[in-house]
């Protein structure tokens, strides 16, 4: 998780060095912060709904989240929320999106690239499809608001809430040590 975040940050830094488009602004705004929280909660609820009705997605989400979350302890979940939320949004929405264009093509390329990053194997395609939809929504929010804060906050919320729910559900399944 930490290594991936550093690699993504380095890619973003190198990209910014060579690309005159620059970085999408990140402006602290209560309204955009609340919009990011709302978007993050909406994405999380939509994911929960898809989890219930799409068996292939459920299987792939469980496999992916087991791989990522099982070795983590509760305090690590804070880092899981912050590191990918910041590094992935900086690269995909902060740097890539303005470089390609704050338009439909930019949204499509940014969202699809984000989805592909979340595919650990070809069998994980249902999870990649959902991650692509999420990437499109995050890119759209960045274009509409012109503020990187919205997708960053949304991404952090999705990661934090999803990981806490997963940990709670799987903690209850463990046998007691009595």
Summary of predicted features, one role per range:
Residues 1-68, 72-84, 160-178:
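Specific transmembrane helices
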Residues 53, 57, 66-178:
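Transmembrane helix-loop-helix hairpins at the membrane interface
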């Amino acid at each position: 998780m930490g290594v991936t975040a550093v690699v993504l940050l380095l890619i973003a830094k190198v990209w910014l060095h060579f690309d005159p488009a620059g970085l999408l602004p990140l402006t602290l705004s209560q309204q955009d912060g609340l919009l990011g929280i709302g978007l993050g909660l909406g994405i999380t609820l939509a994911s929960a709904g898809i989890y219930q009705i799409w068996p292939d997605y459920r299987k792939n989400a469980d496999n992916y989240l087991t791989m990522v979350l099982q070795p983590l302890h509760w305090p690590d979940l804070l880092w899981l929320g912050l590191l990918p939320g910041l590094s992935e949004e900086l690269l995909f929405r902060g740097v890539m999106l303005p470089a390609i264009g704050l338009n439909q093509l930019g949204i499509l390329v940014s969202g699809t690239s984000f989805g592909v990053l979340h595919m650990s194997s070809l069998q994980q395609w249902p999870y990649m499809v959902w991650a692509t939809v999420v990437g499109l929504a995050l890119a759209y929010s960045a274009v509409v608001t012109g503020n990187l804060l919205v997708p960053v906050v949304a991404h952090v919320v999705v990661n934090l809430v999803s990981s806490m729910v997963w940990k709670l559900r799987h903690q209850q399944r463990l046998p007691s040590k009595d």
